[in-house]
Regions:
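Short acidic, Gly/Pro-enriched loop/turn segments at secondary-structure junctions
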Residues: 1-6
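Polybasic (Lys/Arg-rich)
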Residues: 8-106
């Protein structure tokens, strides 16, 4: 079966990465001033929006459907990023960071 570019865009273009889903959500991420200058230059998604804040941090808003690949990209920024919204994504990242920290007991 042939699939048109428009159909592909409809299914894959609104989500994040290669993972698709039914409901499109919006992630709001705040990057530290140290990471801001690098992240502001990155293209995470064709429909992303970003703004440099007065304190030097950078806020990135990005659409996603399935969080799998987005969580991986968030995690690579470690302590330089905070998930502001949605709460479900914030909790997923918090759990992953807690599990990672447990690998390094005092």
């Amino acid at each position: 079966k042939s699939v048109s570019d428009a159909q592909l865009e409809q299914v894959l273009g609104t989500g994040y990465g290669i993972f698709a889903g039914d409901k499109i959500r919006e992630a709001v991420l705040r990057f530290s001033p140290e990471a801001a200058r690098w992240v502001a230059r990155e293209k995470w998604h064709s429909r992303q929006s970003g703004r440099l804040e007065e304190d030097g941090s950078y806020t990135l808003t990005i659409p996603y459907a399935a969080e799998t690949e987005l969580v991986m990209d968030i995690m690579r920024h470690g302590a330089q990023v905070e998930v502001i919204a949605p709460d479900s994504l914030r909790e997923t990242v918090r759990q992953r960071l807690t599990a990672a920290a447990a690998q390094y007991p005092d």
